[in-house]
């Protein structure tokens, strides 16, 4: 009977250890996925910044050209 108890405790202990290791690996994988998601969102933000900057430049040039044309027409 004592042998059976020791065997059962050993099996339970090894099961808990393996479960603990699996949980730790799962947490590490989740952390890596979160970091990848953060990197992707940063890349998206950077691309949006560039896009909006280019739109701003184009709009500014268009307004400047319009104003310049109006001024030139007024001088004539």
From Swiss-Prot:
Cellular component terms per the entry's GO annotation: extracellular region; membrane; other organism cell membrane
Composition bias of kind Acidic residues appears in 30-41
> What is an example of a Pfam family matching this protein?
FSAP_sig_propep
The record's region (Disordered) falls at: 24-44
- Using the UniProt record, give the first listed, main subcellular location: secreted
Provide the leader sequence positions. Answer: 1-22
So which domain of life are we looking at? Eukaryota
Give the tissue specificity: Expressed by the skin glands.
A single BP term in Gene Ontology: innate immune response
Query: Residue positions of the PTM Glutamine amide?
Result: 73
- Residue positions assigned to the propeptide: 23-45, 74-76
Q: Which UniProt keywords apply?
A: Amidation, Amphibian defense peptide, Antibiotic, Antimicrobial, Cleavage on pair of basic residues, Cytolysis, Fungicide, Hemolysis, Immunity, Innate immunity, Membrane, Secreted, Signal, Target cell membrane, Target membrane
Coiled coil ranges: none
**Where in the cell?**
Secreted; Target cell membrane
The UniProt similarity line reads: Belongs to the frog skin active peptide (FSAP) family. Dermaseptin subfamily.
> What does the function comment of this entry state?
Antimicrobial peptide with activity against Gram-positive and Gram-negative bacteria and fungi. Has been tested against E.coli (MIC=2.68-8 uM), S.aureus (ATCC 25923, MIC=2.68-8 uM), S.aureus (ATCC oxacillin resistant, MIC=2.68 uM), K.pneumoniae (MIC=10.71 uM) and C.albicans (MIC=10.71-32 uM). Probably acts by disturbing membrane functions with its alpha-helical amphipathic structure. May penetrate bacterial membranes, but stay at the mammalian membrane surface. Shows a very weak hemolytic activity.
Query: What is this protein called in UniProt?
Result: Dermaseptin-SP2
Q: What is the lineage of its organism?
A: Eukaryota, Metazoa, Chordata, Craniata, Vertebrata
């Amino acid at each position: 009977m004592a042998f059976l108890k020791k065997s059962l405790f050993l099996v339970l202990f090894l099961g808990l250890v393996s479960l603990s290791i699996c949980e730790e690996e799962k947490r590490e994988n989740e952390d890596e996925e979160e970091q990848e998601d953060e990197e992707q969102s940063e890349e998206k933000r950077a691309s949006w910044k560039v896009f909006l900057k280019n739109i701003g430049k184009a709009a500014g040039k268009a307004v400047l050209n319009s104003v310049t044309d109006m001024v030139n027409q007024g001088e004539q």
